[in-house]
Amino acid sequence: MLFEGLDLVSALATLAACLVSVTLLLAVSQQLWQLRWAATRDKSCKLPIPKGSMGFPLIGETGHWLLQGSGFQSSRREKYGNVFKTHLLGRPLIRVTGAENVRKILMGEHHLVSTEWPRSTRMLLGPNTVSNSIGDIHRNKRKVFSKIFSHEALESYLPKIQLVIQDTLRAWSSHPEAINVYQEAQKLTFRMAIRVLLGFSIPEEDLGHLFEVYQQFVDNVFSLPVDLPFSGYRRGIQARQILQKGLEKAIREKLQCTQGKDYLDALDLLIESSKEHGKEMTMQELKDGTLELIFAAYATTASASTSLIMQLLKHPTVLEKLRDELRAHGILHSGGCPCEGTLRLDTLSGLRYLDCVIKEVMRLFTPISGGYRTVLQTFELDGFQIPKGWSVMYSIRDTHDTAPVFKDVNVFDPDRFSQARSEDKDGRFHYLPFGGGVRTCLGKHLAKLFLKVLAVELASTSRFELATRTFPRITLVPVLHPVDGLSVKFFGLDSNQNEILPETEAMLSATV
């Protein structure tokens, strides 16, 4: 018994020694990791590097970021201030909040900073994209792509977008159970990108498979760039390969069949604009370009669409005020009419309250956290040095949350953007849902157009109610969205705002 007791004590002592050793090893390695990055400060600059933590060796604070969501940024901003250092997705990073700080970064493109997304994002989107290009190449690509989002182009997309949204809402209303809004919004924006923007005639079965693959691609765009079996990065690479193969097939079929088209889609305009600028696009450039267009139209717009529906659910007075505006303009149309082309750009631009609603959704629920840059030369920001070679992320969402020009920043209040109040008029960098400077989002007008049409159709043709007791928690990765997707039951409305019976709804769906 004595020896057995000694064996137990010995085992516990050994275990305790191991735990102490591991703890000490982690503490020492973490301290060395901090010193490793502290040594990269620019010795010629007397200012200190921003405060913050670099986390653990190699992984940094990526785990904390993924688990804490919005709490990660807010807790560190509270502890370290508007400019702090961290280590995310395999690289050192300085996160920046505040209009003046963000302005310096956005206006410093090409001489202080240059765009650089995380390595996983760069590799998965491809080298031929607008977002990954710099300097003259970036300027030339923006000129080519700008034709896709011109006023004339948006006017030609509008009837098709409206019809896709009408069909989708009709399907949601005819569904006997509640739907997952975020998942369905992703399908809607994906369908819009494929059918309307790119003009691809992909069979429904193939489109469903392509959507699943694209979902896998998007889920891993922001992942640790570690190419190992079963890693998120490897899954993203595999999804990209499948997508590229499917896109090449669709592009070749589209180029061979040009008959019977009643409008020029984005891919047509991209090819045409490229030729106008003296360049013939290669197949690889076309594949990367279409992949980027889908990415731009898909994830962020689905996020904003879900946020729009959630806020209309939370604030019925906003929805009713929106309906009043539509009635005043004579466009609160019948839910039983699938007519295409009843909206025009000038009509939408005249809906002032609708514009305020969309702006407030984008202020309070900006789909992406911010943008990434790499530092070309050391500069000063908020009393700290931002060393050459480091990465910087300017925070859109936190800049909105801390902007002094907005009263009651956490309250959903569309009237803050009304002509009477115009809280966004003081300082252009307090409100920047689409970024700013030379890299302002090219597709921002298309995104706002889509959201406005969706809001008009929701107010005109649908009643909807939350199918759960409480509203879900919000997560931020890869874009802002409800953790459960937002479960909502939809009901169709007729021209008198009366609920359409399920049998009638089914008959209407069958005629489309």
Swiss-Prot record:
Highly expressed in brain, particularly in the cerebellum and pons. One of its GO terms (molecular function) is iron ion binding. CDD domains: CYP26B1. Its cofactor is heme. Its EC number is 1.14.13.-. It catalyses: all-trans-retinoate + reduced [NADPH--hemoprotein reductase] + O2 = all-trans-4-hydroxyretinoate + oxidized [NADPH--hemoprotein reductase] + H2O + H(+); all-trans-retinoate + reduced [NADPH--hemoprotein reductase] + O2 = all-trans-18-hydroxyretinoate + oxidized [NADPH--hemoprotein reductase] + H2O + H(+). Keywords: Craniosynostosis, Disease variant, Endoplasmic reticulum, Heme, Iron, Lipid metabolism, Membrane, Metal-binding, Microsome, Monooxygenase, Oxidoreductase. It is found in: Endoplasmic reticulum membrane; Microsome membrane. Heme binds at C441. It is a peripheral membrane protein. GO terms for biological process: bone morphogenesis; cell fate determination; cellular response to retinoic acid; central nervous system development; cornification; embryonic limb morphogenesis; establishment of skin barrier; establishment of T cell polarity. Induction: By retinoic acid. GO terms for cellular component: cytoplasm; endoplasmic reticulum membrane. InterPro entries: Cyt_P450, Cyt_P450_CS, Cyt_P450_E_grp-IV, Cyt_P450_sf. Belongs to the cytochrome P450 family. A cytochrome P450 monooxygenase involved in the metabolism of retinoates (RAs), the active metabolites of vitamin A, and critical signaling molecules in animals. RAs exist as at least four different isomers: all-trans-RA (atRA), 9-cis-RA, 13-cis-RA, and 9,13-dicis-RA, where atRA is considered to be the biologically active isomer, although 9-cis-RA and 13-cis-RA also have activity. It is linked to Radiohumeral fusions with other skeletal and craniofacial anomalies: A disease characterized by craniofacial malformations, occipital encephalocele, radiohumeral fusions, oligodactyly, advanced osseous maturation, and calvarial mineralization defects. This is Cytochrome P450 26B1. The gene is CYP26B1.
